[in-house]
């Protein structure tokens, strides 16, 4: 057993322009819990907000830097395209669609992705969010021991230009959804998808350098000229999956990190011993990585993939209850010990938040 192995997604960090608007959207419209109010440790004048499930578990965490003056980000090579959260079934997904549209949020789908079913929408800054069903899973068209070895084109009727868009748009829950109930609660991410300039080079990096398991080789259902490749940790369960659309070099512009765009995403490991092992493995592969950095709630190292995506390997602990009662996470501004002496000045630069 590889004790340093990546076990799944830890978190994804994006950029927002307005912390209060972001809190209102993710807690009020998506039912996530604000599990930590702190600051960007590398830029203490900016909020760093963490949203997740009630336990603030790795794999549930979506975080934001508040940069009000940031340019509008856009997707492209070197940036994330979207982040997906998991819902149990098509029925709970239909309820999500009815809830979101009932709250004035434009939703596309549900789309049949063969391995799961998807709806899409955007947050107030334009971050693309997907809610994907748990199944049916990767083995609907491949044996478990042969995943990701051969190209699996999707049924043509599921692809852009061939599917019945009007019928898809009409699918929703038949009754109004007055609130996000327990069955709808988003407990973890499903996957993260980014854009790559060379799909096979990217597969080599994630599968060989990072040791993730190839899960699927298919095509982008919305742009059948581009491949869509998937890797995961362990058995490839939701919450462990990273995917990318591949494009020919020069055929797509580079993305721009800004508001409405991902800054980086983090993969989960057990502890600092695993991080030290990853520093050695990355160095042996010629991939520069940072020293281990103390992020208070976890430890981190940072590096980049071949297209320049900022990646992080983060530890599962010590967790978000280290400085706050677990029943009151996210209710007040928390600073690490090395910033406490500057609390008054830091708080004075931050716009107060209304939570709950």
Predicted regions and their residues:
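Surface-exposed interaction/gating patches
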Residues: 8-9, 175-221, 226-228, 235, ...
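Residues that form or immediately flank small-molecule/cofactor binding pockets and catalytic motifs
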Residues: 39, 69, 136, 219, ...
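Vicinal oxygen chelate
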Residues: 1-5, 7-17, 69-185, 188-197, 227-230, 279-356, ...
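Short intrinsically disordered coil segments
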Residues: 65, 80, 146-150, 244-246, ...
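Core segments of cupin and vicinal oxygen chelate
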Residues: 4, 15-58, 110, 194-239, ...
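Active-site-adjacent scaffolding segments
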Residues: 41-97, 101, 105-108, 119-125, ...
């Amino acid at each position: 057993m590889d004790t340093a192995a990546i076990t799944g997604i830890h978190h994804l960090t994006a950029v927002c322009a307005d912390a209060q608007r972001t809190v209102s959207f993710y807690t009020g419209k998506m039912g996530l819990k604000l599990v930590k109010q702190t600051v960007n440790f590398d830029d203490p004048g900016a909020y760093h907000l963490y949203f997740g499930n009630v336990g603030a578990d790795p794999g549930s965490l979506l975080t934001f830097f508040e940069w009000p003056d940031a340019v509008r980000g856009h997707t492209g090579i070197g940036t994330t395209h979207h982040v997906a959260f998991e819902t149990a079934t098509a029925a709970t997904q239909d309820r999500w669609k009815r809830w979101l549209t009932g709250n004035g949020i434009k939703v596309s789908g549900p789309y049949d992705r063969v391995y799961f079913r998807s709806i899409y929408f955007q947050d107030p800054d334009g971050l693309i969010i997907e809610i994907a069903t748990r199944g049916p899973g990767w083995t609907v068209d491949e044996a478990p021991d042969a995943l990701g070895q051969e190209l699996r084109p999707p049924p043509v009727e599921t692809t852009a230009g061939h599917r019945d868009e009007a019928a898809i748009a009409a699918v929703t829950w038949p009754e109004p959804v007055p609130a996000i109930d327990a069955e709808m609660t988003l407990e973890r991410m499903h996957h993260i998808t980014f854009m790559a300039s060379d799909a096979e080079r990217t597969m080599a990096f994630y599968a060989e350098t990072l040791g993730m398991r190839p899960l699927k080789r298919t095509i982008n259902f919305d742009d059948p000229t581009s491949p869509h490749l998937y890797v995961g940790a362990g058995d490839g369960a939701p919450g462990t999956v990273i995917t990318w659309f591949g494009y020919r070099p020069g055929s797509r512009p580079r993305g721009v990190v800004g508001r409405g765009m991902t800054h980086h995403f983090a993969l989960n490991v057990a502890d600092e011993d695993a991080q030290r092992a990853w520093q050695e493995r990355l160095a042996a592969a010629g991939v520069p990585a940072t020293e281990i950095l103390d992020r208070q709630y976890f430890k981190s190292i940072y590096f980049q993939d071949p297209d320049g995506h900022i990646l992080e390997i983060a530890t599962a602990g010590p967790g978000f209850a280290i400085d706050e009662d677990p029943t009151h996470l996210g209710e007040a501004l928390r600073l690490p010990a090395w910033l406490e002496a500057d609390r008054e000045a830091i708080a004075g630069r931050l716009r107060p938040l209304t939570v709950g």
